[in-house]
């Protein structure tokens, strides 16, 4: 089934009206010039409103040109106003196997430090090895008072590390293994010499990575297990949580995933609820990297009780036992 794209934006509608209204006012069409204008208007309507597999023709053209312009992977932009720190989460000491997403979400605003987003990312391999990280992205503008109280030089990275250590301590108190994560402990999503194609990133004839946006709706608790059940060498899944604009009680959520396979990705989504990032895999995978300071696409108001209904995979025992002391930061 060919998915229908979102409702056209104002700019797209305005351009169509600029082409259609003069032709409509010229009715009845009698001269050759009138019919030429009619043809131009029809072409504009088809070009701006036409779509294929959920993407407007103009979006397809723009992404195709972007692939040609990209000679290498997009580097994370340098910034001194945003930083991301990571906490690894290991298996719990008790019988519980449900990651406390509601508790983790409370660290969006905890101990006077406000996070722009909190992201839970899991990587599961074909052998069943599972690793999970919780990323906190902190923005300087949202924490000026807290930063100035600590130092006159605005120690953004140190402040974010404090939040990460407190989250790790809290998780350990309730029975989970946890600690701050070092940059070299995060596996690469894509090899540096991979080449972007329309359907994914190609490293070799038997190594492809495809990115997908996941619909963050009421069906998300069913979508995530369906993604994990797909055959793949690696499955990356991320859930990002943020406060809704102007609120400190309502959440927005976004989700994304990436599948590493030894075959070329198909042209359609492998699971209902996924939107392939055709022609946009480099930006999507760059944002999906657990160390990224970028937000995931597609933030929407969180359905009621979504976090309590989501079952996040439990990391395998021993996967994170290496002593880690440094927090990840992209500044």
Swiss-Prot record:
Any one of the GO CC terms: peptidoglycan-based cell wall
Keywords per UniProt: Cell inner membrane, Cell membrane, Membrane, Transmembrane, Transmembrane helix, Transport
A Pfam family assignment: EccE
Transmembrane listed as a keyword: yes
Leader sequence residues: none
Location of the protein in the cell: Cell inner membrane
Induction: Repressed by IdeR in the presence of iron and by Zur in the presence of zinc.
Transmembrane domains' residue ranges: 11-31, 37-57
Topology versus the membrane: Multi-pass membrane protein
InterPro entries, A to Z: EccE_dom (IPR050051), T7SS_EccE (IPR021368)
Purpose: Part of the ESX-3 specialized secretion system, which is important for iron and zinc uptake or homeostasis.
Family (UniProt): Belongs to the EccE family.
Oligomeric and partner information: Part of the ESX-3 / type VII secretion system (T7SS), which is composed of cytosolic and membrane components. The ESX-3 membrane complex is composed of EccB3, EccC3, EccD3 and EccE3.
Name of protein: ESX-3 secretion system protein EccE3
Organism name: Mycobacterium tuberculosis (strain ATCC 25618 / H37Rv)
Species classification: Bacteria, Bacillati, Actinomycetota, Actinomycetes, Mycobacteriales
Encoding gene, per UniProt annotation: eccE3
């Amino acid at each position: 089934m060919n998915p229908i794209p979102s409702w056209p934006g104002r700019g797209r509608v305005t351009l169509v009206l600029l082409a259609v209204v003069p032709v409509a006012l010229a009715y009845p069409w009698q001269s050759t010039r009138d019919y030429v204008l009619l043809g131009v208007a029809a072409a504009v309507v088809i070009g701006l409103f036409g779509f294929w597999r959920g993407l407007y023709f103009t979006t397809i053209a723009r992404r195709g040109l972007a692939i040609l312009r990209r000679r290498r992977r997009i580097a994370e932009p340098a910034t001194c106003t945003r930083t991301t720190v990571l906490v690894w989460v290991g298996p719990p000491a008790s019988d519980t196997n449900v990651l406390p997403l509601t508790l983790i979400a409370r660290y969006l605003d905890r101990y006077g430090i406000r996070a722009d987003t909190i992201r839970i990312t899991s990587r599961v391999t074909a052998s069943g090895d599972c690793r999970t990280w919780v990323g906190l992205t902190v923005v300087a503008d949202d924490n000026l008072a807290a930063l100035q109280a600590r130092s006159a030089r605005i120690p953004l990275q140190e402040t974010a590390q404090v939040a990460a250590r407190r989250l790790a301590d809290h998780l350990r108190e309730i029975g989970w293994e946890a600690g701050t994560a070092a940059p070299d402990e995060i596996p690469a999503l894509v090899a540096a010499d991979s080449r972007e194609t329309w359907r994914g990133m190609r490293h070799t004839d038997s190594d492809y990575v495809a990115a997908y946006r996941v619909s963050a709706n009421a069906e998300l608790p069913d979508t995530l297990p369906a993604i994990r059940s797909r055959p793949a060498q690696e499955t990356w899944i991320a859930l990002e949580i943020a406060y809704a604009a102007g609120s400190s009680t309502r959440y927005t959520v976004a989700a994304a995933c990436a599948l590493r396979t030894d075959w070329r990705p198909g042209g359609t989504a492998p699971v209902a609820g996924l939107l392939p990032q055709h022609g946009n895999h480099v930006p999507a995978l760059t944002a999906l990297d657990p160390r990224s300071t970028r937000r995931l696409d597609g933030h929407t108001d969180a359905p009621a009780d979504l976090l309590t209904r989501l079952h996040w995979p439990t990391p395998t025992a021993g996967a994170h036992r290496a002593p880690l002391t440094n927090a990840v930061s992209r500044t």
